[in-house]
Amino acid sequence: MSWQTYVDDHLMCDIEGHEDHRLTAAAIVGHDGSVWAQSATFPQFKPEEMNGIMTDFNEPGHLAPTGLHLGGTKYMVIQGEAGAVIRGKKGSGGITIKKTGQALVFGIYEEPVTPGQCNMVVERLGDYLLEQGL
């Protein structure tokens, strides 16, 4: 299965029980910042934004004072799981990033999708990739 298929079929899909509710954007990005696959709507990010995200996974709390930036959008960092998941909020939307052994799984959402639904979609794929040794 191609990485693009994971993005299209497992991240940008209808959310269970909520037809027409789906993430706004999604991607799978290597720890080095190389994009493995992304939705057409995923923002163009700067290398320093990806570096900040990777630093926060290694040093939890690193992004809290400045916020998480992706594609020029600033998200307020909210409770995640140290070293495993970063969550951010901006207005009625937000972002979830799950770290696997080799990649970061990104999901970006806006209402009517809820933070919990985004977390479920992103973390389910991230957990699957971890189980596969990826």
UniProtKB/Swiss-Prot annotation:
It is found in: Cytoplasm, Cytoskeleton. One of its GO terms (molecular function) is actin monomer binding. Keywords: Actin-binding, Allergen, Cytoplasm, Cytoskeleton, Disulfide bond, Phosphoprotein. Occurs in many kinds of cells as a complex with monomeric actin in a 1:1 ratio. It comes from the Eukaryota. The modification Phosphothreonine is found at T114. Disulfide bonds join C13-C118. This is Profilin-3. Pfam families: Profilin. It comes from Olea europaea. SUPFAM superfamilies: Profilin (actin-binding protein). InterPro entries: PFN, PFN_euk, PFN_sf, Profilin_CS. Phosphorylated by MAP kinases. Binds to actin and affects the structure of the cytoskeleton. At high concentrations, profilin prevents the polymerization of actin, whereas it enhances it at low concentrations. A motif (Involved in PIP2 interaction) lies at residues 84-100. Gene3D superfamilies: Dynein light chain 2a, cytoplasmic. Belongs to the profilin family. One of its GO terms (cellular component) is cell cortex. The variability of the residues taking part of IgE-binding epitopes might be responsible of the difference in cross-reactivity among olive pollen cultivars, and between distantly related pollen species, leading to a variable range of allergy reactions among atopic patients.
